[in-house]
């Protein structure tokens, strides 16, 4: 557990300048992601640790939304899901994801509104991709909308990225500051509760580091 983690974890951040959400490569993301990448972006140890972590969050019968998905969703195979919906940028990658029951192509940097009704999902995941969002608060507001009451959003990340497509804030921050940044997204989205961060794989290990930031939709 990171030292600043708690059930009342606060990012400690105020407003973030808009320039920190710019990218080195400002060309259309659709061009960059047109070529399928059927590779894993974290090592096998981090993948298994993430799957084990998801297993703790999930119940049989849950509906899952995998945002910024690819050809793997890292969900535990032994669980039964009522639905696993994926959103991504490359059709071939999503077609190769055997865990998805349905998917759609959407560039969240161009259009943040999700094509789902209110309160459809028990869990929303964003795995090793949050660093590419240029309008993250708007996306997190949509996540809140589509989550069921008591639903959870889990954002995971490592130290890997496509530097030209990651926002400036991600490139200049480090692991624990990345946690604060993602917590700030949850805070600015307005209604999330129980924001927590955890380091699942140490940056001092011989494996890829892995962090998660989670928050719940708790109606008060």
Regions found by a protein language model. Give the residues of each.
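A short acidic, Gly/Pro-enriched loop at the edge of an enzyme's catalytic core
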Residues: 111-124
């Amino acid at each position: 557990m990171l030292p600043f983690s708690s059930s009342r974890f606060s990012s400690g951040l105020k407003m973030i300048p808009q320039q920190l959400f710019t990218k080195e490569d400002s060309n259309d993301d659709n061009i960059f992601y047109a070529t399928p990448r059927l590779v894993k972006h974290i090592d096998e140890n981090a993948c298994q640790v993430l799957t084990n972590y998801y297993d703790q969050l999930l119940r049989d019968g849950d509906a899952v939304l995998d945002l910024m998905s690819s050809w793997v969703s890292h969900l535990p195979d032994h669980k039964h899901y009522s639905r696993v919906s994926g959103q991504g940028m490359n059709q071939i990658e999503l077609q190769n994801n055997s865990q998805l029951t349905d998917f759609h192509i959407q560039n969240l940097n161009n259009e943040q509104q999700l094509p789902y009704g209110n309160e459809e999902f028990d869990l929303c995941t964003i795995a090793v991709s949050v660093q590419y969002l240029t309008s993250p608060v708007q996306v997190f507001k949509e996540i809140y909308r589509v989550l069921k009451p008591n639903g959870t959003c889990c954002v995971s990340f490592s130290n890997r990225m496509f530097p030209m497509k990651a926002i400036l804030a991600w490139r200049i921050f480090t692991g624990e500051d990345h946690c604060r940044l993602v917590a700030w997204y949850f805070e600015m989205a307005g209604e999330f509760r129980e924001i927590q961060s955890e380091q699942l794989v140490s940056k001092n290990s011989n494996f890829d580091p892995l962090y998660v930031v989670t928050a719940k939709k708790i109606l008060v």
